[in-house]
Amino acid sequence: MKNISFARIVILWFCSMAGWAQKATLTVDFSKEIGSMQPAWAWFGYDEPNYTYMKDGKKLLSEIAALSPVPVYVRAHNLLTTGDGTPALKWGSTNAYTEDAQGNPIYDWTIVDKIFDTYIERGMKPLAQIGFMPEALSSKPEPYRHHFVPGQSYTTIFTGWTYPPKDYKKWAELVYQWVKHSVARYGQKEVESWYWELWNEPDSPYWGGTVQEYCKLYDYSADAVRRALPTAKIGGPHVTGPAGRRGGNFLKTFLKHCTQDTNYVTGKIGAPLDFVAFHAKGAPKLVNGHVQMNMGTQLRDISTGFEIVASFPQLKNTPIIIGESDPEGCAACGMKTDPQNAYRNGTMYSSYTAASFARKYALADLHQVNFKGAVSWSFEFEDQPWFYGFRDLATNGVDKPVLNVFRMFGMMSGKRVDVKGNFMYPALTVRDSSVRRSTPDIGGLATKDEGTAAVMLWNYHDDDVAGTAATVDLTLKNIPAQKVNITQYRIDNEHSNSYEVWKKMGSPTNPTAEQITELEKAGQLARYGESKRQTVKDGQLIFSTTLPRQGVGLVTLEW
């Protein structure tokens, strides 16, 4: 009898837990400000700079610029790489620097200008990457051009463009001429608003030299930038994950050089450093036939990077830019060759992005650092198969669900305010062990501005498996108005999701014009229900909404 009673208790407990697990509560207190809603999300980047001025590249850049209330910063590789400008995966070129038969420099800014003109025309700002090494300057130029194919080893791409210059003064003159030309073309005030940076991931095979050779190159580059424009902003070093020994040690060595060591050019102590940059990536894998994300890996890189910068008192207020901040490393590795990347077309990429950005802000608060931006290394790949599974924001001119998260961020401004939830994982829990419990992370990020407020909410889990939709009881406290207009937006399988529409079409390899129009419409951010005007009682509103697994919602209030 006792066993039967115990079994019944266990069954009832599991049943109650199953029901409780889907009943989430989120409480937003608009009177408790926790920090500024710095538009750290309004930063994007990609390997292939020549896609910038192509048809779908221009279209996507226009959409990115339109979704943000502030200028968007764009970072691209290969801005000084030698070549004819023909685009390819993980490759790009501008031919900005060549030499004549006598070794005299020849500068040609035609392609670089074409890239930057595309940004400036849209009100965007370059995070101008000084790299990579022109063939004529490389200390080991052959072989130079690589041909990357998805699925092949990364090691094949690290060729002559990765090496230090054979002449540091010629390199410095190239940098000087580029900045000087930029000022002449765009004006001093415009170029003062840019960020100049040196190289990419110099702690990896992207740099064929030593850490000290990088520091030397940085000194020559920074000196050249400042000679051309004394008010220009210069920084680095864009190392890989600081939580790893290699990236962390490189970052520490570089920061020590900039603050304490002798400058290779001036002979004085230190080097200009207007911002510090490092990269942070997650680590998805296949588990029992499904994708399992690892947000914790990315957040540990961010937390360690913040901690390293904060350990230098001179850099306490120096802006930090996470130069690549993504669920994993290779944007040009599609899901067919890398099945762990199958999260990219659907809503898991969206919910991961929402949940991870909230924790980036929380970690910046924890370490008390100046978190300026986090570059989402995702753009578009011209003339590639539909929904191939690249880490991109759009496919063949059609927006993917993840782009709509950034449209949501574009409606959030002012101050971040306190959010608490019974299923919202603490930021340090996500950092240390990711989202691996039996229950999902049902959380929120909320802001308050003059006459407006917004609450982003998500139903995220690392495991990309089907889950029951959650009922979320949302309590909004201390609303400074008596009546508000409430609008909801949604990203899930039925809303803001071109991928699901494409699959329902039969996954056409060559959609018709009518189908493309339908897909473009499905790629836009969709409202969830009708806008409503509601009365606020005692500064408070309470209502419920349903949020599917891996879904993202946004609630906006206007008064």
List the predicted regions and their residue ranges.
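Short, conserved phosphate-binding/catalytic loop or strand-edge motifs used
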Residues: 194-200, 323
